[in-house]
Amino acid sequence: MAEFLPPPECPVFEPSWEEFADPFAFIHKIRPIAEQTGICKVRPPPDWQPPFACDVDKLHFTPRIQRLNELEAQTRVKLNFLDQIAKFWELQGCTLKIPHVERKILDLFQLNRLVAEEGGFDVVCKERKWTKIATRMGFAPGKAVGSHIRAHYERILYPYNLFQSGASLLCLQKPDLTSDTKDKEYKPHDIPQRQSVQPSESCPPARRAKRLRAEATNIKTESDSPEVRTHNLRRRMGCAPPKCENEKETYSAVKLAEKREHAGEQERDKAKARSKKPTSAVDLYVCLLCGSGNDEDRLLLCDGCDDSYHTFCLIPPLHDVPKGDWRCPQCLAQECNKPQEAFGFEQAARDYTLRTFGEMADAFKSDYFNMPVHMVPTELVEKEFWRLVSTIEEDVTVEYGADIASKEFGSGFPVRDGKFKVRPEEEEYLDSGWNLNNMPVMEQSVLAHITADICGMKLPWLYVGMCFSSFCWHIEDHWSYSINYLHWGEPKTWYGAPGYAAEQLEDVMKKLAPELFESQPDLLHQLVTIMNPNTLMAHGVPVYRTNQCAGEFVITFPRAYHSGFNQGFNFAEAVNFCTVDWLPLGRQCIEHYRLLSRYCVFSHDEMICKMASKADILDVVVASTVQKDMAIMIDDEKMLREKVQKLGVTDSERVAFELFPDDERQCYKCKTTCFMSAVYCPCKPGLLVCLYHVEDLCSCPTYQYKLGYRYTLEELYPMMNALKMRAESYNEWASNVNEALEAKISNKRSLISFKALIEESELKKFPDNDLLRHLRLVTQDADKCASVAQQLLNGKRQTRYRSGGGKCPNQLTVNELRLFVRQLYALPCVLSQTPLLKDLLDRVEAFQQQSQKLLSEEMPSAAELQELLDVSFDFDVDLPQLAELRVRLEQARWLEDVQMASAEQNSLTLDDMRRLIDSGVGLAPYPAVEKAMAKLQELLTVSEHWDDKARNLIKARPRQSLSSLVVAVKEIEEIPAYLPSGAALKDAVQKAQDWLQEVEALQVGGRVPVLDTLVELVTRGRSIPVHLDYLPRLESLVAEVQAWKECAANTFLCENSPYSLLEVLCPRCDIGTLGLKRKQKKLKEPMPSGKKRSTKLESLSDLERALSESKDTASAMATLGEARLKEMEALRSLRAANEGKVLCSEEDAELKVCVCQKEPAAPMIQCELCRGFFHTGCVSVPHALQGPRVWLCPQCRRSEKPPLEKILPLLASLQRIRVRLPEGDALRYMIERTVNWQHRAQQMLYSGNLKLLQDKVGSGLLYNRWQSTAGPLPETNKVSQTIGAMSFSMPHDWDNRTIYLHSPFSTGQQCIPLHVVSTELDELMMEAQLLQVSLPEIQELYQILFTKQSPSLQAEQKPSVGPSNEKSECCRGKKDGMSYMERKLKRRFERESFCDEKRARVRKMRTPKKKKLKLSHTKDVSSSSRMERERERLLEAQRSSESHLVPSDTSFSEQEDSEDEDAICPAVTCLQPEGEEVDWVQCDGSCNQWFHQVCVGISPEMAEKEDYICASCAGKGSPYRK
C-alpha cells in the first residue's frame, strides 16, 4: 500500500476580540472562503479560555467498539467477500484457508475481480491470461505464478462463482481445501452479526492477533439465544469431529431452520420457521435422489434440512462421508442467498468514567507506539491509522465515546442554573455566543424557532476519544452547519470536502464499493464508512485536513462531508446551527431525504410556519428569506392537494400534526415527517403517507382515504403576507429617509434626526440595503464635517514653525476652507458650526491681504514678519503666504547667526561653518545669503585643508622636525577660524620647545641627572608628536639604568624574594616587626624611649623619597648613614627584647615567639642576628648532618649576600652610566659601609685581644649559664636554610655546648652571647650579619673565637674547611697574565732591594700601592680586570695553603693605606722576629698584605717559587658564597 500523503490544510482564522464578539457575523464574514474547503478552524483570542464544567467523576458512558479495518469501505467489501467464501465452504463441511503465493497472502478478492474483468474463468484459461493477471496483482513475471494462481482460483473461487451463477453443484467434486499446510486459516468477521443492538460480553480495545492462522481452530459465534441457534449462523472455522448418531438424531428432531418469505403479498421482515419433517424413521433414511433407503452407512444427512442423500447418488459421487457439517444443494443455496444485513457498531460491554476511559486510552497508545503518549508525532499516528484501516491482516479494535447527551451529564461549557459554579471572572462565558449551548438558540439561528430539544442539533453532544477512534464520512442532519470545540486532550484530525463536491464524493464511494450501497443506499448517512482521502483525491474529490488542538473550534459548512480520527485521549463537544442562508439548502435536503427514505430530525415546513407566525419580530432579512421559502412551500402544497383531489380523496380534516410524536407522523414510504398534510386509510390506523406517496398507502380505494391538513391554503396566504408586510415594514422608514435627504434649505433636518433614522433601522433590523448605506454615508459625512468644523473653531497651530513649511495633513487650505464652508451649506442636514466657520473664513482672507502687502516690500523687518506670523497662529488653516513669510524670516535669522559667529577672532569653528552652510543651503536664493555662503565655503575649504594637513603632520611617521612644524603653525595662525588639529599641532610644538629647554637646562647644570627626572622626560617626549633629537639618547640611558637594576637584582635578590632591590641595599627599616600582615603584639620589655615601630612600607617610602630628593651623592650618603644608625639602634633593642624572653616565667601567657606568634615550645632555634626564637616546625632549619651553622630567621635573611668581587663591576658600570638613582646611592653606601667594617674587623684581628677572647671561649666562660647538654636537633623534611654567608660551619665542639634543658627555650642551636665577652665584638658581629656582602673576615672571626685546638690540631682540621678551599678555588677567575707577571717581578725586585732597616723596607714594599676596596678607586685601572686578578690570586693562595697546611683559623682582611712608619705583620700569631734579615712575603690574593715568612710558615724557596694566599683571602669563597 502506498504511503499516506496528507491533504492540504484548511483555512485557519484567528479573529480579533471585536470580530469574536458576534459569532454569526464572523461566520458570515468567513463563509465565502471557508465554503470552498467545507471545513475551517477558528482559534479564539488567547485570553478566551472557558472553564471545563463537566463533573469528571459522575460522567459515565458506554463507548462504541470500532474495528478499524471494518470501517474502510474497500476493506469492508473485501472482508464481506471473504466471509461469503468462508460461509460457502463451511456449509459444505470445509474450512477456508487463504493460500500464500511468493511468500505473500493471496488477495482472493482482487483475483476474483480481475478474472471477472478479463471475461471469467473459461475465457482466461482459453486465452491464457493467467500470467497477465499475476502481473496485475503485483507478482514478478517469469516465475510461473500464473499457474499457481489458476490452481487456487479453480480450487477456491471457481465453485463459488458457479454457484452464484446458478449452476448445480451436485456435479462438482468437492476439492480438498485443507490439503495445503502452508495456507492460513481464514477467520470470518461475522460483520452482519455485530450490531449495536446486542453488545458483546467483552471487547476491549486492544490489538488483536492476526486473522490468518497457521493451524485450524474451532471458533463459535453465539447467536441471540440457544433456542434459535442454527448451524448456518454458527460459522465454524474448522471441521468438527463426527457426531454420534444418537446426538444427530436428537438434534435433528428439534432443529429449526429460518426461511425468508419472498412473496409480495406477505409482510416484510417476518421470518417463518421451516415446517418440520415427518418423524417417520423411513423418511429419515430415504435418499431423495434414488428414493431408496439402502446403504444406510453411505447415506448423508443434511445438517440444514435433514434430507438424506447417498454419497454415490451425488454427481459426482463422494468417496467418503464429510467429517464436518454438510449442507445439501437446496440448503446451500438458501443460506448463501440470504440478503446481507446492514452494518453498524456494537456497543462495548463496559461502562466507563472519564478517568477509567482515559487510563485505558493512554495505556493503549503508549503500548501501541512503545513511547509516552505526548511524544508520539501526529504525522506518525495519521499514517498508521490509514494503514490499519486498509489492511485485512491486522485487527485493531478501539472504543469511542460518541454522541453522549450533554442534557444528561452536563455540557463542558458552563450554563446558567447548572451544577458547575462559575467564578465572577468566568460569568462572561455563560452568555458567550461561542458557548455551544447558546449558539443554536441565538436569534440569528433559525433552529431557535424549533421548540423541541434535539440532541446533537440544539443540545450539544459530547465526544470522548482515544487513539484511532474515528468518525466516518458524513454530512450533518438537514445539511446544517456544525461547530466542534475541543475542550482538552490530544488533537483531533479532520478531513473535509466542500459542499459542492458532496455528490462527487458519493459517486466515487459508490463506484469503489458498490456492494455496500446495494444493501444500504443511505450508507453515508449511517456514519459507519470511511475512505482514504488519497483515494478520493485521486478521483478528483477536493479534500482538506486540519489538526484541531485543545481550545480550538472546527466549523463544517452545509452539505460538507467530513470525517476524522482522534490522536489520543480527548474531550470534545459539538452542536448544529443554521443561519438564514441555509434555508434554501434545508428544503433541498428534505427532497433528498425523500428520495433516500431517510428519517428527518425535524419538520422543515413546521419550522417555516412557526417563523411565519412570529413575522412581526423576525429580522427583516430572515422574514424576506422565510417568505420566499414559504412561497415555494405553498405552491408545492397547492399542487399536491390538487393531485390528491384528482385521485379521489375528498374527505379531509384538520390535524395538529405538531402534537404527534415524530415517529407517529412519518410517511410510510419515504419516512418524511409530515406537517402540512398527510393521507391515511381507516384500514390501517396509525399508518399515513405524504402527498407524494398516496398510491403506496394500501390497496383500498382512494375514496376511502382521508386527507389530514394543518392549515388551509386560505390560512397560509395571510401568514405569507404577514412575512411580506414584515419585509416591507421599513417602507415608511425609507420614505422618511428619502424626504430628509431631499429636503430644501429651509426644511433641512438636524444631524440628530438623521442619527435617529439610523438607530430605528438598527432597532427594527432593517436590511442593509443601498438606502441604509447611503443614509449612513451621509450621516458619517455630516458627522465628520461637524468634527472638522469644531476643530477649526477651537484649534490653533500646534507648532510655531513646522519643519519644511509644508502643509499639515489635517489642515485645510484657504480654498478648501472656502469649499468646506460651501459644503456645510450643501449638506442635507443643518450644523451649528456653519455660521462660525463663515466668520473664520472672513478673517483668514483679511490675513492674506495683509501678508501680500508686507511681502511686496523689498526688505521687510524681522519684527514685522514675526508679528504677522503670530497672527496666523489663531488659524488652523494652511495659508500659502506662511511659507514665504517663514522663508524670509529664516534668511534674516541666518544672516544674523553668521554675523554673530564671525564677530570674535578665531571663534568660528569648523562645525559652526558646516552648520551654517548646511542651514544656508536649505534657504531660498537671496543675494545677501549667497554672498555670505560663498565666503563661508571658501573659509571652510581653507580651514579643512590646513586642519587635515595639521592632523597628518601630527600623525606622520616618522615624526616631523620641530622647524617644519613651526612653519606650519605660523600658516595656521593666519586663518580666522578655530582648527582643532591646528590647535593640537600648536600645542605639540609648544610642548616640544618646553621639553628641549628642560633637556638643555639639565645638560647645562653639569649635575648627574636623577633617574626619575629622566623617566619623566622620556615619558613626556614619547607623547609629543614631534621628532626630538635628544629622545633616543635619553631612552637608551634609561634602558641602561633598567638593565643595571635587573643585573643588580639578579646579583643580590634571592629567588622569589619578597624584597625589592632598594630594600636589600638600604639599611633595614623594618626591624622590630615580623613582616606579617597583621599587627603583632608588643613584647613586655619596653622599647627604647623615642623609638616606635613603623611599617615597612612607610619607612621604605620615606627613605626612597629622601634619596630621590637629595641634591647630590653626599647628601644621599648622609641620609643612608642616618638610616644605618637607626637600624643599629633598633636591632640592639630587638636583640635585647628577644634575649629577655628567656628570663620570662613559664606562667607568662602573653609571651609569644616565632612567626606563628604562639607560646614557646621545644625544640626551638635562635636567629643569630635578631636573637629571636622560632619553632623548628615553623621555619626551615639546617639538617643535622650538615653540622652546626650560623642560622638567620626568614626576616633577617634578605639577600644572597654575594662576594665583594661580584659587586664591584656593578659599581663600575653604574659610574659609566652617570645617572643617579636610589639603588645606586644605596650600593655605594653599602660598599663604603662594608669597607669600614673590614677596617674595624682587621683592627680587631690585628690586636691582641682576640687571643684573650679565644681563651675565654675555650675555657667555657661564655657558657657558664648552660647546665646540661641538649640532644641533636630533630631532623626535618624541610630544606635546610643555608643563607649565603650566614651558614658558617662551626667547630666540632660547637654541639658540645651546654644549654638549659628544662626551659621551653630549649634549642637545637643557640646564638653566641658575645655581649658578655665584648660589647665591641658583639657590635662588630651584629653589623657583619647586617651586611649584604660575603666577607672572609666574618668567617675568620668565627674561626678564631670558637676554635680551642692547638695549632697542630688546627692544621689537621684544616681539611674540614673544605668548602672554603673549594670556593676559593672556584673564585679564581680570568686573569690578566701581563699584570700578574709584572707584579711578581716587582715583588722580587723589592725583596732584593730591602734595606736593613725595617721601616725603609716596609715603605719600599708599600711604594707600589695596591688597589683598595674603597669608593675612591683610581680611574686608570678597571674594576673588572682587578676582580679577575684578585680571583686568580685567591685560587693560588688556596693551593698554597693546602700544600703548606696554613691554619684555617687565621684570617686577614684588607687594610687601608697608612702613613704609619712602622710595618706590622697582619698575622694574629705574629712572632715579632728581630734582626736585619727578616724575610717577608706578600699575599697574592685580594688583600696584598705583607707577612713575616716565619709567622706564616713559608720558606724563602717557597716564597720564590709559589704564590702565597693568606688565610683571609683563601676563606672568602665557600662559607660566603652559596
Curated annotation (Swiss-Prot):
Residues 428-594 form the JmjC domain. Histone demethylase that demethylates 'Lys-4' of histone H3, thereby playing a central role in histone code. Does not demethylate histone H3 'Lys-9' or H3 'Lys-27'. Demethylates trimethylated, dimethylated and monomethylated H3 'Lys-4'. Acts as a transcriptional corepressor. May repress the CLOCK-BMAL1 heterodimer-mediated transcriptional activation of the core clock component PER2. Signal peptide: none annotated. Its cofactor is Fe(2+). Binds 1 Fe(2+) ion per subunit. This is Lysine-specific demethylase 5B. The lineage of its organism: Eukaryota, Metazoa, Chordata, Craniata, Vertebrata. GO terms for cellular component: chromatin; nucleus. The keyword Transcription applies. It comes from Gallus gallus.
